């Protein structure tokens, strides 16, 4: 072990989705870990609390020439580099020297092939992915659909993709106390939380609420967030006569959003395929909610085992979503069962501590096996991870989920 003494993570900016994972890297490696932030955060993300509490291990290249020079040197000298959304120049010399590199990527084709045929982007994709297919670079997949997307791109990263994601802080709970807290309303409580954008499809849960009310179910739906669809949703609620069932709340900071999740029994995630990952699924599972998630979100196939720790519905299908919610409303014991199993999934495997250790274990296994990207595709057997972060990523099609099976 301990093949990895230095790890440098390059990305455009540092945010709360990355902090917990990076904190774990720092606990293990100390000053051997650095996060390189290559650009200032956009105003709207900063206003959402993304840029708060920046740790000492973060180095901002845009603040000084000295910082930029350090980042350039670390790109070559580090035992392991993780490339997020950052200039490709950082890994080019490194790959020429055959040094191990992990690319941290959501699915590249979530909008289809259209961008691949824009000349500027075609050139970029060839440089980043196709030219490097046989170099010492592997993919940490921040979507269950990433591996197949890269395969479609002229078989980039052949058999070199591993499950990963984004890892917000894992919160520890006393499950008995948490379950009691969720039952205080006296009826089943459902939460939808996020930016109210078209790609998030919040209208689906409002339509499902109408179906549930018409079927005589007792429940409350709380919707948290702001965005272009907020007025549309408020109008839907009035038009459908749901004012007694549906309430709204404005945007919450990340910490307050997590607290709100802990108060609700069911969490619904409705986004379409433009949702690269969907960290709210992670957060809902951690909060011991019975999560009902769209099948096409990047996190869903990795985190949710249908009818074990949550439920999956067919993306965009109100009937499918309604039926899954009815399953839970018909059986409150099922809500608690899925909630407890959800927490255990996150507590045992899908958490920042395990993810950081798994990255280092995978990297050490590849180095031990003499990986050069061309001749070696698998880590040594003792380093292989069977399930969870850094286990092998399979190929998953958009239409993988068959409702009712």
Regions found by a protein language model. Name each.
Residues 41, 145-146, 163-177, 228:
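Short beta-strand->alpha-helix junction loop in the catalytic core
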Residues 290-294:
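Short hydrophobic beta-strand element within catalytic cores of glycosyltransferases
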Residues 245, 320, 327, 334-349, ...:
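A short, well-ordered alpha-helix in the C-terminal region of glycosyltransferases
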Residues 181-200, 206-209, 222:
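Conserved donor-binding/catalytic core segment of Leloir-type glycosyltransferases
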Residues 296-307, 311-312:
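Short acidic/histidine- and often glycine-rich active-site loop of Leloir-type glycosyltransferases
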Residues 262-276, 289:
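Acidic donor-binding loop of glycosyltransferase active sites
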């Amino acid at each position: 072990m301990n093949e990895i003494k230095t790890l440098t993570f390059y990305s455009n900016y540092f945010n709360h989705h990355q902090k917990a994972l990076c904190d774990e890297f720092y606990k293990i490696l100390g000053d051997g870990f650095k996060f390189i932030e290559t650009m200032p955060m956009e105003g709207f993300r900063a206003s959402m609390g993304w840029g708060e509490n920046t740790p000492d291990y973060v180095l901002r290249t845009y603040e000084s020439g000295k910082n930029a020079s350090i980042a350039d040197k670390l790109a070559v000298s580090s035992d392991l580099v993780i490339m997020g959304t950052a200039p490709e120049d950082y890994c080019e010399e490194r790959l020429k020297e055959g040094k191990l590199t992990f690319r941290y990527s959501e699915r590249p084709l979530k909008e289809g092939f259209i961008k691949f045929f824009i000349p500027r982007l075609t050139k970029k994709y060839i440089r980043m992915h196709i030219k490097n297919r046989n170099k010492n670079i592997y993919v940490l997949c921040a979507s269950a659909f990433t591996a197949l997307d890269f395969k479609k791109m002229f078989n980039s990263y052949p058999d070199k993709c591993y499950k990963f994601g984004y890892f917000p802080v894992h919160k520890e709970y006393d499950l008995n106390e948490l379950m009691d807290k969720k039952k205080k309303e006296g009826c089943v409580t459902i939460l939808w939380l996020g930016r109210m954008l078209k790609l998030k499809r919040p209208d689906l849960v409002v339509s499902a609420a109408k179906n549930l009310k018409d079927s005589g179910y007792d429940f409350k739906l709380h919707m948290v967030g702001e965005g272009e669809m907020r007025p549309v949703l408020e109008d839907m609620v009035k038009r459908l006569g749901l004012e007694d069932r549906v309430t709204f709340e404005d945007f919450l900071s990340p910490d307050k959003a997590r607290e709100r999740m802990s108060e609700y029994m069911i969490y619904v995630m409705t986004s379409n395929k433009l949702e690269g990952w969907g960290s709210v699924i992670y957060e809902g599972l951690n909060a011991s909610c019975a999560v009902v998630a769209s099948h096409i979100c990047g996190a869903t196939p990795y985190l949710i085992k249908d009818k074990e720790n949550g439920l999956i519905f067919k993306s965009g299908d109100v009937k499918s979503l309604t039926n899954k919610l009815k399953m839970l409303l018909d059986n409150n014991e099922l809500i608690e069962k899925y909630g407890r199993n959800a927490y255990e999934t996150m507590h045992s495997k899908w958490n920042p501590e395990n993810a950081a250790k798994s990255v280092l274990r995978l990297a050490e296994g590849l180095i031990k096996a003499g990986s050069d990207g061309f001749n070696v595709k698998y880590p040594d057997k003792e380093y292989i991870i069977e399930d969870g972060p850094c286990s092998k990523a399979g190929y998953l099609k958009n239409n993988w989920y068959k409702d009712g099976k």
